[in-house]
Structure formats: C-alpha cells, structure tokens
Amino acid sequence: MIEFVNAKLNIGLSVVRRRSDGYHDLETLFYPVGRFNGTPENPTPFCDILEITVNHSGGGDDFQFLGRHIDCPPEKNLVVRAVNAFRGECVARDVAMPDMKLTLEKHLPDGAGLGGGSADAAFTLNMLNRLTGRRLEKEALSGIALSLGADCPFFLENRPLFAGGVGERFEEVSLKLDGWWALIVKPEVYISTKEAFAGISPRAPRFDLRNLGKLPIEEWKEYVVNDFEASIFPAHPELGAIKEKLYDCGAVYASMSGSGSSIYGLYRDEETIRHAASMFDRGKYVCKL
C-alpha cells in the first residue's frame, strides 16, 4: 500500500489562552496542500511517499527512510512511534497485528510549520488500520494521533477544517480554494516551539475563522492574521521580508504557516505564481490548490 503524504497550511492562527496544563488553546484553519495522485516514478517534490506492507520475513517491523535526512533517533521518528502506538493499542485489545515493512521517502521540509512529520504519522495510522482490517475505531485513532502531536488528528481527516483547543477540536468550514495556487517559501531558519510561544500574549481572535469562506480572499490581508508573526518576525526579519516579497510579486494573501518558518502566498493564476517563484533562489514550492 502506497500513499502520497501531503502537508497543510494554517490560514490564520490565534493564540487564545494559556491553559492550566501549560499548553495553549488556539484557533486556526487547516488547509491541505500538496496532495498528489501520481506514481512513485513521477511524484511531486512537495509530498512524502509512504509505503507499508506486511513483513512476511519475520523479525519484527522493518523501517527504511529515504530522501531528506530526518535529524532524530529512529525511536523518536513519528512514523516509528505511530507504529508502536498502534501496535500497543492492538495488544491492549488482544488483537493480532503482523510485522510491518515501512518505507518513507521524505520530501516535505521539516521545521516548516507545514505538519510534515505529523502527516507521516497520521497517514501511517490510517494505512495500518486499513491493512489490519480496520481494527481500531475513529476515536481510538484520534486518541493515538493526539498523543503523537497536536497536528496529527487533522491529517486523519485531511480536509479544510476549523480547529480549536490545541488543534484537535474540529468544525466543518465552507472554504474551497480550487483553482488557486500557493507559493511556499522555506528559508534556512529553525524556530523552536519554545521560541515561538515565548513572545506570545494570548488574546481573543481578531476574526472568526469559521466564517472565512464568506470573506473575499482580497480582504484576508486585513482580517486574517497569524499571531506568531508579531513575535517571530522581529527576531527573524528575513521572514517578514519574504512575506512582503510575496505580496510584491502579486500574492493576494500571504502568511506564515503555523509557528514557521515557512511563508506562503496565494495566487490567482499559474503565470503570476511562476513569475513569483522565479524571484526566489531556493526552498520554494509551487502547489495548485
């Protein structure tokens, strides 16, 4: 079984309050980006390729990682953790699960605010569930996903959704960006979660993102903001410069995704976005929405 693993964009992100457990309640709109329906021989560069099969040779689960280097010990890789968590739930239910062989070809950038690692984990959970005859119900999968990361539950759904809480409480939204293009720029900047939240002052959202589909995209620049930009851009001015450059190159809306460091711009047509992409030397990805 092979899946092409897409990323996500945050359209608007408000840090609403700090919780008693030390986490923060957020409000954001997740939008999938980079989905691909091609073949392994001709993939888009903006997706990961995940293959999972039953390992008939025995000897336990077998993992192979290709493509971009993942800078963490294997046992901390989210795909490995997803398999172990899924197997643990099966053991707890006295459900048999065969050994698996997993190959992850990594293309999505990490540390980008695009949810690449979370997407890999969520796709792993969904694929394992299908391969084992859908042994786990949706609630169980969601619980495992949340234990792996706040973005993981979204990728189980993988469609435009409003998210609250730490990012796990979803509401349907009416938003379609069919025909639009996204230019995503990922500079060589790493922003830790600690740094991202250090300069944040929680506040009420400026705009209710549940109503984003009713607001013309031409007006998003005025109302739809990512709260992290206010604290991160002064510390990393090159990120703010990228956002302004996207606007200068014709973007109708531009924003940082998540806590960065990717900056994206939305464009109406292919000609404009191709020209915009030519203005950046590296770390750029053009995606049709």
Label each region the model flagged.
Residues S57-C72, T124, L146, P216-V225:
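Short, basic/glycine-rich phosphate-binding loops at helix/coil junctions
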Residues L156-Y253, R268-R282, V286-L289:
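Conserved, helical-rich catalytic subdomain that frames metal- and/or nucleotide-binding sites
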Residues T103-T132, A150, V252-Y267:
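Glycine/serine-rich anion-binding loops at beta->alpha junctions
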Residues A121, L125-F162:
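Contiguous, small/hydrophobic- and glycine-enriched helical/loop subdomains that border
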Residues M1-A112, R130-E139, S174-K176, K186:
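ATP-binding N-lobe of GHMP and related small-molecule kinases
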Residues A82-A92, A140, I144-S147, A241, ...:
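Generic non-transmembrane alpha-helical segments
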Residues V80-D99, N126, E222-I242:
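A short, flexible low-complexity segment enriched in Lys/Arg and Gly/Pro that occurs
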Residues I11, L50, V79, G117, ...:
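Residue-level signal for inorganic ion chemistry
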